[in-house]
Amino acid sequence: MAKVRDVIDAMEQWAPVSLAEPWDNVGLITGNTENNIESVIVALEVTEETMAFALGNRVQLIVSHHPTIFKPLKTLTDSNLSSSIIRMAVKEDIALYTSHTNLDQVPHGVSMSLAEKLGLTNITPLAPGNCELLKFITFTPPEYTDRIREAAGNAGAGVIGEYNLCSFTSRGTGTYIPSSDASPHEGESGKLSRFTEDRLEMVVPAPLISKVIEETRKVHPYEEMAYDLIPMSRKELSLGYGAVGNLQEPMELPQFLGLVSESLQVKTLNVSKGEMRRIKLVAVMGGSGKDYIPAAVSAGADVFVTGDLGHHDFLEYCSSILLVDATHRATELPILSTIKERLHLSPLLEGLEIIIDWGKTVQTAYEYNEKGI
């Protein structure tokens, strides 16, 4: 039977908590990682309705995108929604887990799921995230190189764009003198040993380096594994906020708005006034994206689809880019299906029931409003 920690491991192999912004509150909020679970709810946020369903159906874990505790709680009473939910979760031993700004940045995360829902192609991040890259270098007997490369790669090393297990290997001579207390792979205590070694180099996103080192140690033959970590000047290009991609075929504005409405099942779209243009390059940001409008303009996008836009956003950028506010909620909902798909990929979660909480019913009728001058 799956445990809470198995779901956490699956989520954090995809969206490590170390990617989250410093102000964010992610990870396990309540619960015991060793508890057995038969089912899990995936939701944008934990509401009273979510908790009621969990209690009525004996669900032991809820994975949400929005943190249940965002601001510090000074009391645990029924005076507000967050503290009421936390009290209930602790009382009923329901684990609450959150993946927020870390999930925003990863491949197939919040914005990329939105882009995929709209059928975009050649999708890349709109703006860089906060993930630094390291060069991981270790030294090994040649006969161990392949298994070490595989172990490091399985932990997240060696990913460059759409290519996995990227590495460079060079051969040379290593030396060492084992002490009397050492147990060397080869050589004798007190004598200088010279052996042929491979130098294996792989890039690693900084949040994954501890896991890469841990998994490499498990297969490395040396008692003391030598390795170097070198900071790189560029950031991990596959990680970032927002997404930008192409429509398969250019569309006129009314056709594109129909696509957005139908794909996201959102009734009302707020759209900036401006010249009617053909849409080809589309930028998106799941949730609140007004801070990334300049990035969408810089990317040369014809349109930016996001949520939480205000009057002054439409006013300021009406001549620069077409803005479409499809609501915070609707632009984030596609991630729920992606989370379910990712959890199903874990062999440790085979047989686990994964229930999506879509929240309030989304209207499918279509209207759009224009905002701007």
Feature locations, PLM:
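Hydrophobic structural segments
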Residues: 1-373
